Amino acid sequence: MKKAEGTIISAISGYYDVEIDNKVVRTRARGVFRDRKQKPLVGDRVVVQLDDQGMNYLIEILPRINEIGRPAVANVSRVLLVISAVEPDFSLELLDRYLTFFAWKNVGVVIYLSKSDITSSERLKDIQTELEYYQRIGYPVFEDAEKLENELPKMIDKDQIWTLAGQSGAGKSTLLNQLESEAKQVTGAISTALNRGKHTTRQVTLFKYGSGFIADTPGFSAIDLFKIKVDDLRNYFYDLKEASANCKFRGCQHIKEPGCEVKKLVEEGKIARSRYESYLKIRQEISDNRMPEYLKK
């Protein structure tokens, strides 16, 4: 029997739709996965045993890079992080929490500022100034949906999987629907084969976008940072990590240690004070195993 590698793009009631060479193949999982306590996830790269009679089986799950979200998506390369300018209000602290979480998961982030068109020009200018810092430390930032839609297909490499994240009400579903509508005009075959409805279930599917995929889910808004080791947190603030190479002590936690390059650059305005304050606040919460204030509301 022929074997082929592909990507799971949908999982419903024990059936797995796998994209192999731009075609969708419906499969079942062998019992061996249950015996190994392995569960195939949307996004998994898998080996499929193909049968001329249509009885196709998953026989191997290839090693995962990561898994994120609820329900989980495997092998996510990048996240499109939707941050609202207003309703809900823009929050640097929340932005830093998301960036920390995805750095921990080893996932790249592209920031999209939504609702900029209903924000006062004065407030928007302040937000744009704050986001310029994030661009300087390596995060792409978009605030124009049309420009994002033009650039996004070029940014998604072959077989990469992207998903969306952001707080509730930020506009993730609206953006996702726009992207999916555009994608269906280009690759209608796969979308039709899946026969998906609107976002009324907790199922996840992938739709083809550019050379890769976007997860068809409104994403997730809650993030859990408590599993990060407190002394490792500094490594997930990339600007702090870069500066720490010049700290006096190798294990500097950038709190009270003498000769701390991070604190020096904060005082000089070269590292955003808000970033440093986010680091200290998250570090204290992890240390105390304390729920952040924004989740108590």
Swiss-Prot record:
Please list the cofactors this protein needs: Zn(2+)
| Gene (name only) | rsgA
Sorted alphabetically, which SUPFAM superfamilies does this protein's record hold? Nucleic acid-binding proteins, P-loop containing nucleoside triphosphate hydrolases
Know the name of this protein?
A: Small ribosomal subunit biogenesis GTPase RsgA
Any one of the GO BP annotations? ribosomal small subunit biogenesis
* The protein's role, per its UniProt record: One of several proteins that assist in the late maturation steps of the functional core of the 30S ribosomal subunit. Helps release RbfA from mature subunits. May play a role in the assembly of ribosomal proteins into the subunit. Circularly permuted GTPase that catalyzes slow GTP hydrolysis, GTPase activity is stimulated by the 30S ribosomal subunit.
Cytoplasm recorded as keyword: yes
Can you say where in the cell this protein is located?
Cytoplasm
Residues that hold GTP according to the record: 114-117, 166-174
Q: E.C. number, please?
A: 3.6.1.-
Residue ranges of every copy of the CP-type G domain listed in the record: 65-223
Which terms are listed as keywords in the entry? Answer: Cytoplasm, GTP-binding, Hydrolase, Metal-binding, Nucleotide-binding, Ribosome biogenesis, RNA-binding, rRNA-binding, Zinc
